[in-house]
C-alpha cells in the first residue's frame, strides 16, 4: 500500500487533490475553513505516506474529519458540532462506499494519529452501520412475508402534475415503513441503543403498517394472502375489519426470532406513545396512514424530519439501503427480481461477498475465538443470523434464570447462616450500591452514547442479580464440599469478590442484548480494577453451564484484554502488588504447574500442538465424562483447578479490606520473622489435631510445609519443616504429619518452643526431615502461589499460546522458540516497567525479532507482522501506537546503547508504521510505531541479554543463562466424547495397530484432481491393493527408519500442515 514516489509526482498529486477537493466542496456547498483544513491534513499525510488508490477517497476521509471538527454557533444551544454535511453526502460525492470508507478511515486515523475519542466515534458509527445492515437484511424477508413483493410490481407509468393521486404501491409502502423505523430509532435512541431493541422496534413498525393495511378500505391488496397472521375470515367474501386494529407482534416473534415480552413492552410503553406524539405534531395525518389522501403527505413529512435529524444529530443516512445504487454506495445487495440480468446478479454476489468479509473482520455480533479460549467451548451451533443469535442469547439468558428471583435461595441462606459472621447484610449493601451506580450511568447520556430508559436499566439489573445469586450458590456449594464444611466467612466477606462477580453478570446481560456499552464500560462505571476483575471470569465460565459459545468467547476475550494490556496501565493495582512483593516478578517456572512444561530441550511433539484438539468436532468447556461406566455428576466435580479461595486468598479476615489482593509473603519470609523475633511455637498432640482435619478460623494462617533455615552456634545450617497454623497473637501451633509405621513418633504433651531452642537442632533428626521431604514431593504445586502468581501464570500461558502460534506459522525451530521465550520472560521479570501502559504483544514481537536476529535465523518484520495479523486479537493500534515516552529521559537513557546491527528495519512496512510524534491526552506521552519503540527503547534494555545467545560469540555463550522452560498446552480430555448436545453421539480415536498410508499413495482432491486419479484409486481397491508393495511404516514402531528420521527432522513442517487442517475443519 505504501510506496515511495518521486517528489515531482507527489506535487502533481497534491495539485490534483486541490482541484478534486474544490470540486467536492462546491458540490457539497462546504465552507472554506473546513476545505482548507482538509487540504492541509491531506498534504501533511501525503508528505509522509504514499496513498494508494483514488485521491478523492482519501480526500473524503480528510474532509469528514474536518467537518466533524467544525463548530457552528446556534441561536438556542450555543454551538453545534459539525457543519450540516452528512457522511452519506460526502461519500456519495466522492463515489466511496461505506465499507471502503471504514477501511480507509482506520488507516487515515493511524496515519494522522487522531485522538481516541474520534476513533471511538468511528467505531460507534461503524457499529450503527452494522446494526442497520443486519436489521435491513431481516426487514426484507419479513416484509415479503406480510405484504406483496415490491419487486414484482409493474413499473409506474409517467404522469403529469395535474393527474389525480394514485394509491401507494407496495414499493412505496416498503420505503415508508423503513423510513419510519429509522426515524423513530434515531429520535428514540433510548430504545434503539442495541440490536435486540432495534429489531423489536422494527417489528412494531411492521405491525403498525399491517394494521393500517387491514383497517384501510381497499388497501388489503397490499397484503400477502398466505401470511399466517391474517384474520381467520380474511379470505371470505364478507370480511370486514374489526374496529380495534389487529396486533401481529406475537406472530412475528414466533416466525422471525423475536422475544414476545420484549417486543410488547416496547410497543405499549414506547412506540405507541411516540406515534401518538407524531400525530399531535401533525407529522402523521389521517385516520389511516395508507389512505389515498394522506399517504403522500405522511411519507414526505417523515422523510423531511429524518433529513433534519441526519444533518443535525446523525451521521449515517440509513435510507441509503433503499436507493437504486445501494450496492455501490454501501455494499448491501437489494432483493432482486427473477428477471434480473446475470451480470447484475454477479455484481450483487460480489457486493454481498465484500459485506460478508467486512463483518467477518469486524466480528461485532459473533466474536472470534481467542487463542486461549478454545478449550472451554462447546460444539458449534447451527449457522444463524445475527438477529436470531442476539434474540436467542437473550432467550438463553432468560431460560437460565427462569423460575429464580433476585434474592438468595434457601440453600444459599443456609450457607450464609453457617458462617461465623452472616454476610447477607453486607452482600445486600454491595449489590444495592452497584445497582444504583449501574442505573445512573446506564440512563445518563454521554458523548459516547445516549442514555437509555430507566426501565431498561432496571430490567438488565434484575437479570444480572438473579444470575449473580445463581452463580454464587453454585460456587459456594462446590467450595463447601471441596473444603469439607470449612467456614466461608473469609471469602464471603471480601467485597471485591462480590463486586467482580456482579460486574461479570452485568457484562453477560449487556452482551446478550448486544448493547453498545462494551467492555470495559462496566468496570469503568463500577470503578473496578481490571487486575481484580479477571479472577472471576474463569469461575463464572466453569460454574454456569448455560452460557452460549459466543458468551464464553466474549468472556475469554475480556480476560485476554486484561492480561495483555488493561492490567498493565500505569494506575493498575498490579504495580501495588509488585511493590508488596518487593518487586520480585515471578518467573514462568515459579508459577506454572511443574507437569505443564514441555520435556527436553526441544520440547515434546505433544506440547507443540496448541490448537489441535483430539477432535475438531467439540471443544468441551467443562470436562465431562458422559459414559455409563464412568459418569460423574456435575455438581460433584470441582469448579476449577484453582479454587475460589485460592484466587481470593487473604492473610486474615481482619486485614482483608486493606490487603485483599496483596501477594502473600513467602513462607520463608514468615519463618525468618519467627526466628528473629523468637515467636512462640506449640506442638499439638496428634490426637487432638492433624493435618487432615484442621480447620482454619478467621485470624489464622495456614502454614503448609514451610521451612525455616536456622544457623546454629557452630555455623551449620539446618532446615526444619513446619506444618501448622499461625494466629493473631503471633503463636504457631505445629501440626504433626502422618508418619510411616517404622518412623512412628508420638508427642505426649504440647511442648512450648522458641526459636532459640531450635538453634541446637541435632543432625540425628534427619529421618524426620527426609520423611517430610518425601511427603512434600507428592504435592504438585507451583513454587509461588497467591494473587500475583495467579496473574503471571495466566500471562505466561497467554503469551506462550500466541508465541507458539506465531512460530508454527513461520516454521520456527523449537530451539529458537525457546530463546524467544527466554528473552520475553527476561523482559517481564527484569524490565517490568517496559510493560507499563503497553501491550503484551509488543514485547512478544520485539523478542521474536531480536532473537531471530541474534541467532541468524532471521525473519523480516513484514513476515512477523503478516503472521501476527492473522491472530484473532490482532489490532493495528497495537503496532502503530506504542508508548515511547511518558517520563522524561526514558528514551534518551538508552539511546547510547543501541547497535546498528540490531536496528529493526523493514522497507516494506517502515513507512506504513511511521507515526507523527504528538501528545494524546492530558498525560504527557509520546507515541510511535513498534519499530521506533524497538530501536529507541527495547534494544537498549535487552541487547546485552540477547547477545548471550549469539552462536558466533563464544564468550557470550559461556554467560548465557539456561533457556526457560516452555509451557505446553494440555490436550483435550480422552474419549469417548459427545459431539452434540442434541443427540447421543460419541466418538473415540480409532484403536488400530496397522500402519499409516505412505505418502506415495494415490491422492484425489475433490474439485481439484483429474478423474483419472479417482479411477486409479478404484482400480487399486478392486485389485485388493496389490500394487502397494512398499514397506508400511508403523506408527507405534520403535524401530528407526529413514522415513521416520525425515519426519522428525521436519516436524515443524508436518505440525504446521496438521495445524492448517485442523484450522480449516474448525472454520467449517
From Swiss-Prot:
Protein's gene: RBL1
GO molecular function: promoter-specific chromatin binding; RNA polymerase II transcription regulatory region sequence-specific DNA binding
Modified positions (Phosphoserine) in chain numbering: 640, 650, 749, 762, 964, 975, 988, 1009, 1041
Outcome, altering residue 643 to R: No effect on S-640 phosphorylation, but strongly increases S-640 phosphorylation
Parts of the chain that traverse the membrane: none
Function comment: Key regulator of entry into cell division. Directly involved in heterochromatin formation by maintaining overall chromatin structure and, in particular, that of constitutive heterochromatin by stabilizing histone methylation. Recruits and targets histone methyltransferases KMT5B and KMT5C, leading to epigenetic transcriptional repression. Controls histone H4 'Lys-20' trimethylation. Probably acts as a transcription repressor by recruiting chromatin-modifying enzymes to promoters. Potent inhibitor of E2F-mediated trans-activation. May act as a tumor suppressor.
GO cellular component: chromatin; nucleoplasm; transcription regulator complex
Region (Domain B): 781-949
Region described as Domain A: spans on this chain: 385-584
InterPro entries, per database record: Cyclin-like_dom (IPR013763), Cyclin-like_sf (IPR036915), RB_A (IPR002720), RB_B (IPR002719), RB_C (IPR015030), RB_fam (IPR028309), RB_N (IPR024599)
Sequence similarity: Belongs to the retinoblastoma protein (RB) family.
Native source organism of the sequence: Homo sapiens (Human)
UniProt modified residues of type Phosphothreonine: 332, 369, 385, 997
Region listing for Spacer, in residue ranges: 585-780
Keyword field: Cell cycle, Chromatin regulator, Host-virus interaction, Nucleus, Phosphoprotein, Repressor, Transcription, Transcription regulation, Tumor suppressor
Organism superkingdom: Eukaryota
GO annotation, biological process: cell differentiation; chromatin organization; negative regulation of cellular senescence; negative regulation of G1/S transition of mitotic cell cycle; negative regulation of gene expression; negative regulation of transcription by RNA polymerase II; regulation of lipid kinase activity
Annotated compartments: Nucleus
Post-translational changes noted in the entry: Cell-cycle arrest properties are inactivated by phosphorylation on Thr-332, Ser-640, Ser-964 and Ser-975 by CDK4.
Gene3D superfamilies linked to this entry: 1.10.472.140, Cyclin-like
Subunit record text: Component of the DREAM complex (also named LINC complex) at least composed of E2F4, E2F5, LIN9, LIN37, LIN52, LIN54, MYBL1, MYBL2, RBL1, RBL2, RBBP4, TFDP1 and TFDP2. The complex exists in quiescent cells where it represses cell cycle-dependent genes. It dissociates in S phase when LIN9, LIN37, LIN52 and LIN54 form a subcomplex that binds to MYBL2. Interacts with AATF. Interacts with KDM5A. Interacts with KMT5B and KMT5C. Interacts with USP4. Interacts with RBBP9. (Microbial infection) Interacts with SV40 and JC virus large T antigens. Large T antigen, but not E1A, binds only to the unphosphorylated form.
Effect in UniProt of substituting residue 640 to A: Strongly reduces phosphorylation by CDK2 and CDK4
Protein name: Retinoblastoma-like protein 1
Pfam families documented for this protein: DUF3452, RB_A, RB_B, Rb_C
Source taxonomy: Eukaryota, Metazoa, Chordata, Craniata, Vertebrata
